[in-house]
Amino acid sequence: MADWFSSPLKTCTHVCDFPSLAGDPQQEIMCCDSMKNKLQDSRKVLLVSCSVSFNGSFYGGNRNVRGQLQISMVEDDGVCRPIGYVPIGGYLYHNDYGYYEGARTFNLDLESQYLKKDEDYNRKFLVSVFNENGLDSQCDLKVFIVHSIRIKV
């Protein structure tokens, strides 16, 4: 891994907006290095990490909400597997808005095969929200995801 430290660092950023958390919502995102036809030689890509932060709100009285934000990745065999979970939730005593927020970084260190200069590095991710108690149409969530990538020619 030490040979990657001198490689340029690039990020891929996404925002997933869930205006309602009813029905275990999910969104697909694509991590891409956007280096197609920008280099003269083939390259390797190291997907270093996936940083996730979120904030959201819920409404109600005497309300306990909780669930999990799951980040999954489609691996080379085509199977979508979770890379990690971040708990979400809160409690509210009276009729008002409650808020929740959180963040976590998942270290991946996944090295690609050599890519031709005329192809992009792509990796599909799935962002899912799982209801454990009370997450519904009166709850929302905005998720910010930053993938850190290193590129080696």
From Swiss-Prot:
UniProt keyword terms in alphabetical order: Host cytoplasm, Host nucleus
Localization of this protein: Host nucleus; Host cytoplasm
Primary location: host cell
GO cellular component labels: host cell cytoplasm; host cell nucleus
Keyword Cell cycle recorded: no
Superkingdom, natural source: Viruses
One Pfam family in the UniProt entry: Nanovirus_C8
Record's function text: Putative nuclear shuttle protein.
Annotated family: Belongs to the nanoviridae nuclear shuttle protein family.
Protein name per UniProt: Putative nuclear shuttle protein
UniProt organism field: Faba bean necrotic yellows virus (isolate Egyptian EV1-93) (FBNYV)
